[in-house]
């Protein structure tokens, strides 16, 4: 996947919160990741910074994939809710749906993507 330089969708990625979605031992999960970084246009590379004990990292280690939905302005409440709770104790997808937020299945990986986000990115871990 390439990220086009100067493209309007690529520009939205510069400062917005990444809503990272995963599936693994903690089930389908979402978290707000303020440290979501665009690394390269071609190939399209993204880095996220996670705490070693978080459920999101455990899911990614198992599945080797994750989604990033770059939050739109209207999703600030969602960012706050999913960023301040752990999937180890709260079903954040269920809470988000109860708040009226909707999800779609990713096209190439087994995660949900947040509907109406500024940008969707389906990621696979490589190393």
Which residues are covered by each model-predicted region?
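Active-site-proximal mixed secondary-structure blocks
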Residues: 1-127
């Amino acid at each position: 996947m390439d990220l086009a330089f100067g493209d309007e969708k690529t520009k939205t990625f510069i400062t917005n919160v990444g809503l990272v979605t995963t599936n693994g031992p903690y089930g389908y999960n979402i978290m707000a990741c303020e440290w979501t970084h665009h690394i390269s246009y071609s190939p399209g590379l993204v880095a996220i910074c996670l705490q070693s004990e978080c459920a999101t990292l455990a899911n990614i280690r198992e599945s080797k994939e994750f989604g990033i939905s770059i939050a739109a302005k209207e999703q600030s409440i969602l960012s706050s809710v999913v960023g301040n709770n752990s999937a180890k104790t709260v079903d954040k997808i269920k809470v988000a749906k109860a708040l009226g937020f909707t999800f779609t299945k990713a096209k190439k990986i087994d995660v949900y993507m947040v509907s109406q986000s500024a940008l969707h990115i389906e990621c696979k871990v490589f190393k």
